[in-house]
């Protein structure tokens, strides 16, 4: 293998990284020592365990700790570029897919749960194999792979235990579902992506013309496919590359004798799991408390995972969760009766079937919240027609900075890439996943601004959060629009028209502004 000479500039950059690492490590150690977990009740991995106390140590790092942590993680990537032999690095990245597949096997077979009861001495691979149904020598190789990237811990010859990383999956159904989300149909779609990009549909951005359709053998958009009820034979597509779930023995038919696609239930739970990882900051790094008793409409809100995050800390807010009927059925029958039945019973949270490509039936809400959905001009335009002068759309999504940087997002400290490089791998992985399954795009600030402009709206602010995922605040574009909306909403019971009893006419900031305008 050919090696390449290193320059004096390379050596200087390595020393710069070492100094930056030292400074950041000292901050991390200092912040760790200041954290106090003793006053917070230990929580389980239930869906709503993100919130409940304004002491956020168990939920979020301090801003200073967050910055130092992402700097250290970014340094690992920058240092790898400097010190790794190029051929070895290319070889390593070419094979990394199997790390994700190994994690999927461990999560799907619930190995972290098995090890949780075994304590620090763990279980032999034979014991794990007997419980999971996987041949023990093959299972050992899968677990050794994960141990090498610091997921699980090998404590002897073919003996394994949880470490602090794998223990995060212990009894954690939402996070387990998120691991499965990528490793089911999304990765099969990625198998089809290279061929798809060179096909006649490769330049398309339509949701029904993606690599995913080739993977599962359908012409439907993914949402429509997920909503299907099928025979047991159809749960695992026979005429398509996608193999389906590894184990379907737990599935039960409905009264019609057919089965819901298991990917649908997994998707709803995975959105909660992903929200817990990337979305905890959004309940704290946006000033929700200043909104009073505002109405928050979670558009395309799935089973209501984000509302479950907000509810304990901001019980004065009022919430509507909107999504497709089959998703809301799961929310109302499986999730909310367990997690927050009192919020539904007293009317603080309600559910509404809605197709977000159509005008929103909730007129003049204070906040329209969109997280983790496919944003396009049509969706934003449909919301614009429902907005009052003080309404805002909050788009919770990855705002993609690049290694070259941009004016809207503060850069990483030198000599790191402007976007923190290695630390931001996940958003780029997710971007390619969206490309594969729905032709979605994770946008840069400039791309967000252009999209919003096309919808007749404007970007008011990008809220940087203690997360890889930011919040883009969007409002009406100009005073003409705002004046038109003000006249449209005067004198109308915006929420009572929907037959939703607890909403009064033009409440909160919207009502106050309209009254002030009339008095003026």
Curated annotation (Swiss-Prot):
GO biological process: cichorine biosynthetic process; methylation
SUPFAM superfamilies on file: S-adenosyl-L-methionine-dependent methyltransferases, Winged helix' DNA-binding domain
Signal peptide: none
Biotech utility: Cichorine and its derivatives are promising in the course of developing novel herbicides.
KO phenotype (gene knockout): Abolishes the production of cichorine.
Annotated InterPro entries: COMT-like, O_MeTrfase_dom, Plant_O-MeTrfase_dimerisation, SAM-dependent_MTases_sf, WH-like_DNA-bd_sf, WH_DNA-bd_sf
GO MF, one annotated term: protein dimerization activity
Family assignment from sequence similarity: Belongs to the class I-like SAM-binding methyltransferase superfamily. Cation-independent O-methyltransferase family.
Enzyme Commission number(s) from the entry: 2.1.1.-
Keywords: Methyltransferase, S-adenosyl-L-methionine, Transferase
Record Gene3D superfamilies: Vaccinia Virus protein VP39 (3.40.50.150), Winged helix-like DNA-binding domain superfamily/Winged helix DNA-binding domain (1.10.10.10)
Species this chain originates from: Emericella nidulans (strain FGSC A4 / ATCC 38163 / CBS 112.46 / NRRL 194 / M139)
A Pfam match: Dimerisation
Highest taxon, organism lineage: Eukaryota
Protein role: O-methyltransferase; part of the gene cluster that mediates the biosynthesis of cichorine, a phytotoxin active against knapweed, corn, and soybeans. The first step in the pathway is performed by the non-reducing polyketide synthase pkbA that condenses one acetyl-CoA starter unit with 3 malonyl-CoA units. PkbA also catalyzes one methylation step to produce 3-methylorsellinate. The nonribosomal peptide synthase-like protein cicB, the cytochrome P450 monooxygenase cicH and the O-methyltransferase cicE are involved in the conversion of 3-methylorsellinate into nidulol.
Pathway(s): Phytotoxin biosynthesis
Record keyword Transferase present: yes
Name of the top EC class for this enzyme: transferase
Positions contributing to S-adenosyl-L-methionine binding: 300-301, 323, 355-356, 371
Name this protein carries in UniProt: O-methyltransferase cicE
Keyword Transferase included in the entry's annotation: yes
